[in-house]
UniProtKB/Swiss-Prot annotation:
InterPro entries: PSI_centre_PsaK_sf, PSI_PsaG/PsaK, PSI_PsaK, PSI_PsaK_bact
Protein name: Photosystem I reaction center subunit PsaK 2
Broad class of where this protein is predominantly found: membrane
Gene name linked to the record: psaK2
Intracellular or extracellular location(s): Cellular thylakoid membrane
Keyword Transmembrane: yes
Length: 90
């Protein structure tokens, strides 16, 4: 019997290997997600604060907000890399 996960892994196309362009896409997606999250998250400052200087506004951007935006950025980046690799651009 074949494992279903093994069959799905074999059916998926090969993805792009690590390169400078993949790293740049991931960094840009994370910065984009950070900017979106900074303005979209309404209730900030509920968790631990970061040991970094805050932006000029009175909004505190803590560790939970950073983890949320970076997780979203990695999801966006993985989707961008997979989409660009499958279309042949990357």
């Amino acid at each position: 019997m074949f494992n279903t996960a093994l069959l799905l892994a074999q059916a998926s196309p090969t993805t792009a290997g690590w390169s400078l362009s993949v790293g740049i896409i991931m960094c840009l997606c994370n910065v984009f997600a950070f900017v979106i999250g900074y303005f979209a998250i309404q209730k900030t400052g509920k968790g631990k604060d970061l040991a970094l200087p805050q932006l000029a506004s009175k909004k505190t951007f803590g560790l939970p907000e950073l983890l949320a935006t970076m997780s979203f950025g990695h999801i966006l980046g993985a989707g961008m890399v997979l989409g660009l690799a499958s279309s042949g651009i990357l």
